[in-house]
């Protein structure tokens, strides 16, 4: 079977919007090539510049790629894609390119930019096909994203992992809502959490996260559920993680105290810069005290504590 690779050129603020459109079209997953993010990792000596072609490093804005199977409905999907891109609340309408790829190329296209990355002081993330031996005793997570979001090289994920390094001391209970690949749930378990609930609405994400949980040997600690975010969390926990988007965080915030212990931590991420103040106000109105704010490019993450 042949596939059509669709590459959408979009500003950083539109990456998640375009990803959601592809999900609606049935792509199942996306590849994000963000030159600003890649160059930050190169400057930090995490990645080597020779691993990336100049056209990627010098690109003026990110590209979001997806792969759709050729078939009778493909042209209709492309028309719908153009309509949805035109309707996005962005300063400029994203443009897209298309090219045919063979099945064997499609199956591995997303793998070439997924490299081992060290995060914070204690953690490292590697794909299963890369050799990596930590020199400083880091805890290594082996993650294959498949068709789910979150493999450790996106700022929203990285900032959450850095917060978890500081607050997981051992024995905590954690709820990860919108778990994606399960990376934050697995991070919590490997740092010493005693019990972790990982929830996602997406059945593909649930499947991928369960595979990653087993790959990392934490299936006795992490339970993965398919469900509506907080609905699956029945008892109070020490930490709640929500690496989603600003709108969903603000909807979730009033319900988080129901399942979070007093003095417990709420980590939020996936917040674009221009929504950060709005999210902060909502968190404080709900009874949270902001303990920390991290920024990375266009993204913001908050560490909060439930007072009372």
Swiss-Prot record:
Keyword field: Cytoplasm, Methyltransferase, S-adenosyl-L-methionine, Transferase
InterPro entries in the record: Ribosomal_L11_MeTrfase_PrmA, Ribosomal_PrmA_MeTrfase, SAM-dependent_MTases_sf
Record GO terms (molecular function): protein-lysine N-methyltransferase activity
Primary localization class, coarse: cytoplasm
Subcellular compartments: Cytoplasm
GO annotations of cellular component type: cytoplasm
Binding site for S-adenosyl-L-methionine: 157, 178, 200, 243
Coiled coil: none
Class of this enzyme: transferase
Catalyses which reaction(s): L-lysyl-[protein] + 3 S-adenosyl-L-methionine = N(6),N(6),N(6)-trimethyl-L-lysyl-[protein] + 3 S-adenosyl-L-homocysteine + 3 H(+)
Signal peptide stretch: none
Domain of life: Bacteria
One Pfam short name: PrmA
Biological process according to GO: methylation
EC number(s) recorded for this UniProt protein: 2.1.1.-
PANTHER family in the cross-refs: ELECTRON TRANSFER FLAVOPROTEIN BETA SUBUNIT LYSINE METHYLTRANSFERASE (PTHR43648:SF1)
Function of the protein: Methylates ribosomal protein L11.
Sequence similarity: Belongs to the methyltransferase superfamily. PrmA family.
The protein's name: Ribosomal protein L11 methyltransferase
Organism of derivation: Desulforamulus reducens (strain ATCC BAA-1160 / DSM 100696 / MI-1)
């Amino acid at each position: 079977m042949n596939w059509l690779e669709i590459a959408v050129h979009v500003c950083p603020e539109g990456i998640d919007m375009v990803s959601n459109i592809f999900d609606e079209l049935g792509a199942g997953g996306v590849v994000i090539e963000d030159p600003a993010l890649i160059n930050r990792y190169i400057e930090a000596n995490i990645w080597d510049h020779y691993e990336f072609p100049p056209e990627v490093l010098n690109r003026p804005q990110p590209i979001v790629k997806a792969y759709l199977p050729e078939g009778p409905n493909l042209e209709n999907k492309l028309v719908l894609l153009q309509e949805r891109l035109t309707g996005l609340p962005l300063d400029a309408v994203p443009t897209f390119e298309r090219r045919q790829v063979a099945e064997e190329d499609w199956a591995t296209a997303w793998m070439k930019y997924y490299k081992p990355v060290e995060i914070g002081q204690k953690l490292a993330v590697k794909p299963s096909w890369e050799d990596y031996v930590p020199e400083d005793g880091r805890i290594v997570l082996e993650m294959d994203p498949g068709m789910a979001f979150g493999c450790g090289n996106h700022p929203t994920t990285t900032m959450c992992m850095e917060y978890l390094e500081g607050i997981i001391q051992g024995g905590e209970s954690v709820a990860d809502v919108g778990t994606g690949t399960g990376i934050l749930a697995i991070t919590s378990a490997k740092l010493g959490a005693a019990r972790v609930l990982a929830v996602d609405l997406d059945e593909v994400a649930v499947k991928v996260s369960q595979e990653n949980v087993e790959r990392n040997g934490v299936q006795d600690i992490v339970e993965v559920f398919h469900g509506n975010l907080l609905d699956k969390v029945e008892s109070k926990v020490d930490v709640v993680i929500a690496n989603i988007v600003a709108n969903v965080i603000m909807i979730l915030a009033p319900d988080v105290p129901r399942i979070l212990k007093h003095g417990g931590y709420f980590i939020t991420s996936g917040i674009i810069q221009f929504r950060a103040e709005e999210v902060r106000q909502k968190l404080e109105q709900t009874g949270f005290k902001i303990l920390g704010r991290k920024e990375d490019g266009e993204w913001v993450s908050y560490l909060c504590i439930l007072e009372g």
